């Protein structure tokens, strides 16, 4: 799986196992659902740089930082995590997409990225149990009552049904703002134990209603976000979904993640992004000694491109 290096966090787009070996990182790539042409198969993943103002507005430094990296010839450039609500920030200096006052800065960034020749994705995010009260001034929320190291011993409030619906709307509102600003699409951050991930995990989601229980219930939050974004944006607006294959402390295990990939492949998304940390690492429990990347590629159809992250340092990789 080929890619290009950037600050240790790089990605490559894959097809199926047989065709990937015949492609090079510099080869162009067509996203099947929309026909969007990517100039090559490299993707710059979201990286946290903490340069936005307290109100979530982009600073000039942050715009320049990302545009400069986009000029490294990446086919897709992803922003840092952008928060969909004012009280879901995971850290200081985080980009915001929760209000219309963010649109001018987002427009400047999207324009600069387009002029750099890259496809732009804004990564949509909510910290959930990883949104400290010390930053947001309110009790954090999650799928269930949870806590997290670094949260000063504060437990989350489990979201009520109407609050879940409001949160889904917040993600969709943010996607609409990104489209209005000129972004080519969004990436839903369902990895790394943030809010979407908290709904997916068996340990972080202990609900017994329609938003919990089996994988169908635990994935409903993510699926409803995808459906509403698709309803409210242009058909050619791109949606990528990022997930973590394994986070044992959250109750996310490989078997469920592979099944989730199958579920997501039936929705109108354009890319599945797995955060592997090392795309070459083999899975000990796999009888064929395959990597996570190959395992996921093997369970989703060719019509859904796969982005895999981690330890891609050179074109040879």
Functional labels for PLM-detected ranges:
Residues 3-317:
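Flavin-dependent oxidoreductase catalytic cores
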């Amino acid at each position: 799986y080929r890619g290009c290096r950037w600050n240790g966090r790089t990605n490559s787009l894959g097809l199926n196992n047989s065709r990937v070996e015949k492609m090079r990182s510099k080869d162009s790539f067509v996203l099947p659902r929309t026909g969007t042409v990517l100039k090559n198969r490299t993707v710059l993943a979201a990286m946290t740089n903490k340069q936005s103002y307290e109100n979530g507005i982009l600073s000039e430094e942050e715009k320049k930082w990302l545009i400069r990296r986009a000029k490294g010839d990446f086919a897709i450039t992803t922003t840092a995590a952008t928060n969909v609500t004012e009280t879901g920030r995971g850290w200081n200096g985080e980009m915001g997409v929760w209000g219309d006052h963010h649109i001018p800065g987002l427009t400047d960034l999207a324009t600069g990225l387009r002029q750099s020749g890259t496809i732009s994705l804004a990564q949509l995010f909510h910290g959930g149990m990883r949104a400290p009260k010390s930053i947001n001034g309110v009790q954090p929320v999650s799928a269930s009552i949870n806590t997290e190291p670094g949260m000063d011993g504060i437990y989350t409030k489990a979201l009520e049904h109407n609050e879940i619906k409001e949160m889904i709307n917040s993600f969709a509102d943010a996607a609409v703002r990104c489209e209005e600003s000129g972004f080519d699409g969004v990436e839903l951050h369902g990895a790394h134990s943030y809010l979407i991930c908290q709904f997916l995990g068996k340990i972080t989601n202990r609900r017994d209603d329609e938003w919990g229980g089996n994988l169908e219930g635990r994935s409903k939050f993510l699926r409803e976000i995808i459906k509403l974004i698709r309803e409210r944006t242009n058909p050619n607006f791109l949606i990528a979904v990022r997930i973590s294959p394994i986070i044992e402390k959250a109750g996310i295990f490989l078997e469920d993640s592979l099944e989730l990939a199958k579920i997501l492949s039936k929705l109108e998304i354009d890319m599945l992004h797995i955060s592997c940390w090392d795309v070459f690492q083999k899975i000990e429990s796999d009888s064929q000694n395959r990597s996570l990347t190959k395992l996921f590629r093997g369970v989703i159809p060719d019509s859904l491109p796969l982005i895999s992250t981690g330890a891609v340092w050179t074109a040879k990789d």
